[in-house]
Regions:
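Cytoplasmic-entry segments and transmembrane alpha-helices of multi-pass inner-membrane transporters
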Residues: 32-63, 120
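Membrane-helix interface segments
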Residues: 36-44, 72, 88, 118, ...
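C-terminal transmembrane helix and the adjacent membrane-cytosol boundary/short C-terminal tail
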Residues: 40, 102, 109-120, 124-128, ...
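Non-cytoplasmic
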Residues: 69, 146-184
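Transmembrane alpha-helix signature in integral membrane proteins
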Residues: 4-33, 97
Length: 222
């Protein structure tokens, strides 16, 4: 039996890019949520948490409409000469960012909220500029939150199925990630190949969560 590594590499590529994009996007959102008292805060919290409770097919359906040739993002992509978004890796990436957004925002929100305001005020009295305070004081204090956000968003992307199937379909080398490849093997009654993929994903998920809890436990004891 020859093992097809293409879905593995594609999944790792998708998860890595999703994680990086989410850290960039979720950081300002989480910081604003942790400090703002604006009336729209509850609305933003609801929207960023919504993917947690929505069935993946519902989210995938509306993303498919948005990314389709007649949707706003799909039309914009075509006008910019970037090509279609549905059934492409770019579409998968956008869908993964939406789907895994809560797994980045929530840990960062909790980490930012736990920072003692007196430490930030102390940095202000030393005439540190806002960006200097953020990078030299806030980010180091929120490091466990950043680690949790990175690990959870990466691991969640690895296990995606419904959203990626609806947006990307099942194109080998382009959109066929691990979960889709495993589904293919099960449909073809190729249980040995499906077992290798499922077992690998199980070991990966357990290892990631164990390492995360171990790190967070050590951090809280310090």
């Amino acid at each position: 039996m020859t093992f097809d590594w293409q879905p593995v590499f594609l999944t790792l590529k998708l998860a890595s890019l999703t994680m990086i994009c989410l850290l960039v996007i979720a950081t300002p959102i989480a910081w604003w949520l942790s400090r703002s008292q604006h009336w729209s805060k509850r609305l933003v919290e609801t929207l960023t948490t919504l993917p947690l409770i929505l069935p993946p097919t519902v989210l995938g359906f509306y993303l498919l409409i948005m990314l389709g040739p007649n949707g706003p993002l799909g039309t914009l992509s075509e006008q910019l000469g970037l090509g279609p978004l549905v059934f492409s890796f770019s579409g998968l990436l956008i869908g993964s960012i939406f789907y895994s957004l809560p797994f980045a925002v929530q840990p960062l929100h909790n980490a930012f909220s736990a920072i003692d305001k007196q430490l930030i005020e102390a940095a202000s009295t030393l005439r540190a500029k806002p960006l200097d305070r953020f990078f030299s004081v806030i980010i180091p204090l929120a490091r466990p939150g950043f680690l949790s956000a990175a690990v959870l968003s990466f691991a969640h992307t690895v296990g995606e199925f419904g959203v990626v199937l609806m947006i990307g379909g099942n194109i080998p080398g382009e959109t066929q990630v691990l979960s889709i490849a495993m589904y293919d093997h099960v449909e073809a009654l190729e249980y040995q190949q499906a077992h290798w993929l499922a077992g690998g994903m199980l070991v990966f998920a357990f290892s990631v969560l164990y390492a995360l809890y171990h790190f967070n436990h050590r951090s809280t004891r310090r």
